[in-house]
Curated annotation (Swiss-Prot):
Pfam families: WD40
Disulfide pattern: none
Coiled coil regions in record: 416-518
Biased composition (Basic residues): 450-465
SMART domains on file: WD40 (SM00320)
Protein family (similarity comment): Belongs to the WD repeat IPI3/WDR18 family.
One example of a Gene Ontology biological process annotation: DNA-templated DNA replication
Protein's organism: Caenorhabditis elegans
Gene: pro-1
Region (Disordered): 436-470
Annotated function: Component of the PELP1 complex involved in the nucleolar steps of 28S rRNA maturation and the subsequent nucleoplasmic transit of the pre-60S ribosomal subunit. Required for processing ITS2 sequences from rRNA intermediates during 26S rRNA maturation. Required in the soma to promote normal proliferation and prevent germline tumor formation.
Protein name (record): Pre-rRNA-processing protein pro-1
Amino acid sequence: MAYLGVDTSRIAGTQPLEMLLVSSGSPDPHSTIIIDPRTGVSSWSYKGSELQGASTGLVEPLGHDGEHVVITTKERPLVHVLAVHPKDRFHQKCVLPGPVSAIVSDNSGHFVFMSIKRQLYCWLLSTGELLSVIDAHYQNITKIVISDDDSMIFTASKDGAVHGYLVTDLVSADRDHTVAPFRKWASHTLSISDLKITNGSNPRVLSAGADHIACLHSISMDSVILKASSDRPLTACAIDPAETRIFIGTEVGNIAQINLFQLAPEERDLLVQAGDEHNTKFRVLNGHSDEISRLAINTDGTLLASGDASGKYCIWEISSHQCLKVSTMRSVINTLRFIPFWKTISGGEHVAKFRPVWDLKREPTKCDRFAIEVSTEFNSDQKHWNDVIEETIDQLLLESGSKSSAQLQWDAEGPARNEAAKAEKAAENTIKNIITLGDDEDDAPEVGNQRRKSGKKNKKNRKNQKKNDFEAAVIEKKQVEPIVIDDEEEVNSSLQKKFDALKAENEKLKEINKQMYEFVAKEIVDSEK
């Protein structure tokens, strides 16, 4: 192991922003490691005891959190999933219809896409269901890539074709129609060895094949916008995040750099002599003596990682073309990618947010199972979990066409609501009749006679009479009010008894409903186990 031009003492105590995941196809222990690209120091390694002597195939992280990784076995239909955290002993394995040739996961880690021969499989990891299986190509699939927004998947195969699929079509529960690619490119005549996709809303797809050609495809234009022909078969490719540089690797270990910003607008077909070390137009990096198997560029486009078939991998500084680190492993480099710094690597306290169900089905299903995601924080409130279970069961009842618990409870409380409405209406009518009788209309003739008198005395008498009439009406109302209150209390007392009986019955139904939900939830959990 060699470190060239790096002062490791200055950066030894700082936390890196990104790490480098390296894996070789060797059955030896610690064939999968995670290193700091600045120093080359290994921060995590996988012993490989669960593989039982099988050679490591591909290594794919589930999501961007780095809680779990998927490891395939070379030439065997076995796929393993294990936890990255050193104290987490989670490990499961599954037998698939055949060896996996390519694998990719979405950013959440809930979906995984694998290729077996010429078919593309899509699994939902919260239940283990196989959502779809499509015949993507005429020959075996070699590479799968997914866009950074998880909306598109592109596949490459030995037939020289690149196909693009919408993720929504692959994960859809509709099995009545055949999933068709929305993009088809046949820009190669031989097998495609590598496939890369850029970031952003308008990504580009870079492919390299054994026909000595590398093609840059535009998804929006649905065409090839750049074609580079080499003097040697191409085995790997990479493009930086800014889409300014392209790197292509050959079968003899040379890496050619193409600066896109130096090309003229009319230059669409390039001839690259990757074997010429004195090439002035395209810079050639010479650090390998065997076939380049993997190329990767970090997030800011300053570092290039390369691995070959002999197990040697290098880290280059792109601006100066200087090799910063050289190391070797015991077999071909199958996985080489830059990853963000995972908190699970440090070994601190960590609780997994999600556990994949690795009982992967072999036949497509119709989403007849459901899952409740595990909460990251424990909630001891029993009412909270009862509400969660009730909401889940209500959703299932609505999907099946049945009434939910809220609708059943509303129907059960219907008679009580009708009785309450009738009682309220009867009480309003009683009060209205009593107020009408208290208006003291019997004194109207006397008041009318007094109004027919004239003079100031008559006016004063009328005022006094009105005042006396008003006081008499108030007194009469006060005398009647106790009778109204007594009648209302009798009505309310009768209604209160009915309400109490209905309330007790309602509480009893709620308790039965709660017991039913707890029983159903327990049955679901036991069936999952």
